[in-house]
């Protein structure tokens, strides 16, 4: 649905475009697509916390529970086919990194260097 895709694209610009918002200091958004019943997704909870702790002033971390109705449009927009999937957006809200499966905080951190 083009209307849905446009509204998600607009939401991304409103929520995650930091380029013109100097007050935030944020440079990246880390979207973690997963579900509560998924073992690898649960392992990613620790990674999300590590990223928050290490890069909190520069990286906004957001968990997107694919089993919730309110994230279905986001899941479709990003074409999520398997979980967990990590997507990193730059400060313009553009996707710069994607990974499916478990990834360590150390490996993920290389994106933020």
What do the predicted segments below correspond to?
Residues 22-36:
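Short active-site neighborhood of thiol/selenol oxidoreductases, capturing the structured segment around
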Residues 38-42, 86:
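The canonical Cys-X-X-Cys-His
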Residues 1-10:
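N-terminal targeting signals for export/organelle localization
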Residues 76-80:
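A short glycine-leucine-enriched loop at secondary-structure breakpoints
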Residues 82, 87-113:
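Non-catalytic, surface beta->alpha helical segment in thiol-disulfide oxidoreductase systems
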Residues 41-55:
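Typically the conserved alpha-helix immediately C-terminal to a functionally engaged Cys/Sec
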Residues 33, 56-72:
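Thiol-based oxidoreductase modules, predominantly thioredoxin-like and allied folds used
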Residues 25-28, 56-59, 81-83:
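Extracytoplasmic
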């Amino acid at each position: 649905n083009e209307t849905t895709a446009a509204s998600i694209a607009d939401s991304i610009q409103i929520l995650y475009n930091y380029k013109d918002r100097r007050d935030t200091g944020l440079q990246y958004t880390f979207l973690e697509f997963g579900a509560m019943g998924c073992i690898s997704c649960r392992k990613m909870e620790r990674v999300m916390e590590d990223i928050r702790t290490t890069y909190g002033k520069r990286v906004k971390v957001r968990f997107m529970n694919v089993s919730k109705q309110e994230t279905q449009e986001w899941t479709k927009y990003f074409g999520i086919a398997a979980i967990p999937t990590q997507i990193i957006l730059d400060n313009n809200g553009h996707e710069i990194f994607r990974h499916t499966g478990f990834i360590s905080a150390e490996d993920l951190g290389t994106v933020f260097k």
